[in-house]
C-alpha cells in the first residue's frame, strides 16, 4: 500500500519493491506545522496540490496550513471548506489552523477540536482582519479557546514606530536590509512576553512560532517538552540569515 513495510540489513521474504539505501539516512516523514499554501483566493502563488507535492519532495508528509487566505479561515464554515478542498487536492496528510480575529470569539468557542490543528493568532500585522491587537479579544482567546493557541508575535505599535523612524531616516532607500531594524528585538519580545503572560494567566496551551531573538528565549523553560503547556520553535533559515 505504498508504505515502508520493513527496514533491515537483509530481507528474505517476497516484496513488491526493495530499495537499497546503503549510505543514506532513513527518517520518518516530517510534519510542517506552519505552511502557507494560498488556497483559496491566492492561488497565483501556489495551492494545496502544488505545495503539498513540493513538500513531499523534501520529505514532508504532513502539514498544518495557515488561515490567512481569501476568504480568511476565521469561521468554521470556511474551515470546513478548506478540508473539503484538501480531500481531493492534498497529496499528503493535512490539517488546518482556525484563524483568530478581534471579533470571532464565538466561532472559536464552537470549533471542532478533532478537526482544526490549532488556533492561529497574528499578534503582528496580517492579512485582512486577522491582526489581533485588542487586549480584551486576546483575553477572551486565551481564556476560552478549546484549541492550543499558536502565535505570530510582533508588537504592531512598536513596528509602526520603527517604520516611521527608518522611513524618515532613509526615505526611498529603505529596503529589505532594514527589515530587522523595523521588526526588531523589542517588537518581538513585547508581543511574545504578552502571549506568555496571557497563557500563564489562563493556564492556556501556547506555542509561539518562529522566535527570532535570544531575549525571547528567556521567556521559556529549557528541557524536554513532555508536560509543558508553553512552548516555542525557531525557523532554520533564521539561524543563517542574521547579523552574527
Question: Which residues make up each language-model segment?
Answer:
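Histidine/acidic residue-rich metal-binding segments in metalloenzymes
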Residues: 106-122, 127-244
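Divalent metal-coordination and catalytic microenvironments
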Residues: 2, 23, 34, 55, ...
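Histidine-rich, glycine-flanked metal-binding segment
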Residues: 1-28
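Alpha-helix termination/capping residues and helix-transition junctions
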Residues: 57, 88-91, 113-115, 203
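Metal-associated gating/positioning segment near the N- to mid-region
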Residues: 22-89
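Short, acidic/polar
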Residues: 44-52, 102-112, 194
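Short catalytic-loop micro-motif centered on adjacent basic/acidic residues
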Residues: 65, 95-98, 205-210
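Active-site mouth loops of central-metabolism enzymes
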Residues: 33-46, 69, 92-104, 130, ...
